[in-house]
Amino acid sequence: MTAKPLVRPGLAAYFIPVTRHDHHLHQGESLREAAKSRLTQRGEQWTDMRQAVFDALANFDKPASAYDIAEGVSKALGRRVAANSVYRILDLFVQSNLAMRVESANAYVANQHPGCLHDCIFLICDDCGQTTHIDDDSLSSGVREAAAKSGFSASRPVIEVRGKCGDCN
């Protein structure tokens, strides 16, 4: 399978489709509307602050920390926004599949296909920080099966592979 670049300009990530269903990748206003729809379907409100946090997150080229996002929201709103407020919103976004957390970097990326549920698999470049999100259900199901064989119930496998991207190689 070949990687197709995400459609949002400047995003240094690629998406590898899963064969069992189609993904609809969103960008710009479409991404915001898909996120809003997903959140409201879950019975949550799409507040101005949540929109500001989502917009700031979606504008980053690389995984962003809550502090980076708080700084972006503060500039956009013209007032200081605390990182702890952003963390709470990011937690909700992760639970709602609007964002994915890059555990090793304590950073987040917007999910460009919030209607699809997959375990997180990230390829992280040690040189430039480019983070590629891929969906490979065969890999993540293997992790879940191995965990189950050990009597462990995996709630959310996260796989992060560190190395060098094609640009830095």
Describe each PLM feature range.
Residues 46-48, 59-65:
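Short capping segments at the starts of secondary-structure elements
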Residues 21-54:
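Short alpha-helical segments that sit at the start of domains
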Residues 86-96:
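Basic amphipathic alpha-helical segments that dock to polyanions
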Residues 65-79:
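DNA-recognition alpha helix
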Residues 9-10, 14-17:
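Short, positively charged and aromatic/hydrophobic N-terminal segments
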Residues 38, 55-60, 72:
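Short amphipathic alpha-helical elements of helix-turn-helix/winged-helix folds
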Residues 94-169:
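Non-DNA-binding regulatory cores of transcription-related proteins
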